[in-house]
Amino acid sequence: MFSLQLLRTWHNFAKICRTAEEAVEGIKDGALIMSGGFGLGGVPMNLLNAIRESNVQNLTVVSNNPGLGDKEGKLDWGLGILLRKKQIKKMISSYVGENY
């Protein structure tokens, strides 16, 4: 029984999505998400933009840094785009030196 449930669980995550919007459609208000990248490299911007456009709120985000941003919003990058729209309620990071 355990193996079957584990297989079902894994199978549910083995979906190929054709768009970033499809990939994030299951993210609901209050979700916990993790994001990769550091500084300007390896950041999943297509997925983060899709999350931003979905208007989900109260996210808890785990990442090594909260992205980039400035007071005017001209340099927002990475998780900074979600911080700008106040979609992140709690941030768990190891480095926060570059964000506003």
Mark where each language-model region is.
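Conserved alpha/beta enzyme-core scaffold
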Residues: 2-100
